[in-house]
C-alpha cells in the first residue's frame, strides 16, 4: 500500500487540467500511442467542445520512479465548475493529494480557489503546479505570489511544466510521489467503499466508480448500499487505465469500478458507502448528502406531439445525471411539458444542449427561477419553485428567498464596474481584498438575481477577466412580488415572474413594452397588462388592423358614415369576445432578455 498514490487535479476552466492528465497517462503508458487522443478522459462531445469536465473519470497507472520503485498512481479527474461542487468534493475525498494547476500566464482564478479550499478542508495534500510555462507571456513568479496570497499555501517549490509540450511533466509526477501520503486503511477490516461517481451503461446497467477505504471488495460478494439500503450481487470489479480491465478484487486504498446489476442510477448515489452484507461496516463514510436542485425552469416541446419523446429523453438523461429532477406540468400557454430542477445555470445549459443535440428535441424554455419559501398566515410553510404556483398575496405572511455568497476575482481596473453590477443586483458587500493586481470581492446576492443573466453581465463589464463562484448561504425574508402578464385580461402563466418590489414597476413596463413589439396585430385591439395581484402596474395596446369602411361613401351623409363605423366597431367587439391571441414563440424568450435597470 505504500506505493499507491491517489490524486486528482484542481484547475480553473482552460488552465490545462485535461491536457496534463493526457500527458501523465501517456508517460505511464496507460494507452498505446494509437489509442491516445486529446482530452482522453472527457468522454462526452459536449465536454470536449466546451472544454469542461462534467463527470468524474479515473485512470489507474503504474509509474517507475527515479528511485527505481514502481508506484500505482490513481488519477481521479474532477469537474471544475461550481455547479458540480458536490461531485468535486466526493472526488477529492477519495484522494490523499491534489495537483493544483495554475496557468502561469493568468494566475489564480475563482473556481480554482473554491475547489482548493474544498480540498484543504478535506485534509488533502495540495501540490502546486505551474502550467503553460512555454507561453511567451507566462509569468511564473507572479503566479507563485498569487497562490501564496490568495490560497495561502507555500508555493515556492511549485513545479513548472508545460502540459502541451510535455516538458516538466515527469517532475510533476515525482513531486506528487514525494509530497502526497500513501492511503491509510485496513484490508482486513469490514468493507467501506465510497462511490465517487456512477453512470449508466446500456449493456451492464449502472457502473459505479469507487474508492475502497477499508476492507476488500471481491466479485460475487453480496453488497449493501448504506444510504438507500438496497442489496446487490457484485458481478465484476476492475480498474480503468482509461480502458477498463477486470480484476478479481479491489483492496483498501485502490480506486476502480464495480458492476452489480443495478438497474437505476437513483440506487447508486454519489457519496454513498458500499459495505458487504456478511460483515457490515459500523458506520457509513462521512460527507454524504442528497443533492438538491437550486434552479428550476419549464421545458416544453415546440410540437405538442413531442411530449412523450421529451419524457423519454429526460428519462435517458437522468440515467446518467442523478441530479436532474423533473415533473410533468401543464401550462395554458405552452401545453404539456416538464418542470425541471438543475444544480445551476451551467447544468441547465448542458441539459438543454444535450436534449437538442443527442435527442433532436426542439424546446421552449421558460425563465429560470429559484426556490422560494413562503410563510403563510396560518403558520404553514410552502416551497414555491414555479411563479405560477405562488399563493394569493392576501394569505402570505412573508416570502423568503435564497441568498448566495458570491466570490469574485478580477483585475483591479474593473472593480468599479463589477461593484456597480453587484449593487444593481441587490448585493451587499461582505469583503474586499487586494492580492497584487487581482482583487477579491465577496458579496451576498439573492440567487434569483444570479440566475437571470448575472454571469453574462459580469463577463461583459469586465471584458471576460472576472471569474466567479457562488455557494448557497441561507434563506432571508425579502419583499418580492409576483408580476403577472395579462393578455386581453387572460393570465398567461408561462410569462409570470417573481421580482423584487423595488424593481417590479420597471420590470412590468419593460415586459409589456416588449410584448407589444412581439405580438402581431389582430383584427381587434389587444390589451397587454402587467399586474401585481389585482393592481395593474403597466398597460400597452396593440392596435387593431382595420379596413377603411368609408371608402365607398363618396361625399355622403354623416349619419351613413356613422352607421358604417358603428357596425365595424360592433363586429370588432364580437370578435374580441371569441378571439384568442396566439402568443408567438419569441415572447417567452423575450422575457429572459429584459434587462434590469
Swiss-Prot record:
It is a peripheral membrane protein. This is Elongation factor 4. Its main location: membrane. Signal peptide: none annotated. It holds the Pfam family EFG_C. Required for accurate and efficient protein synthesis under certain stress conditions. May act as a fidelity factor of the translation reaction, by catalyzing a one-codon backward translocation of tRNAs on improperly translocated ribosomes. Back-translocation proceeds from a post-translocation (POST) complex to a pre-translocation (PRE) complex, thus giving elongation factor G a second chance to translocate the tRNAs correctly. Binds to ribosomes in a GTP-dependent manner. Belongs to the TRAFAC class translation factor GTPase superfamily. Classic translation factor GTPase family. LepA subfamily. GTP binds at residues 14-19, 131-134. It catalyses: GTP + H2O = GDP + phosphate + H(+). Residues 2-184 form the tr-type G domain.
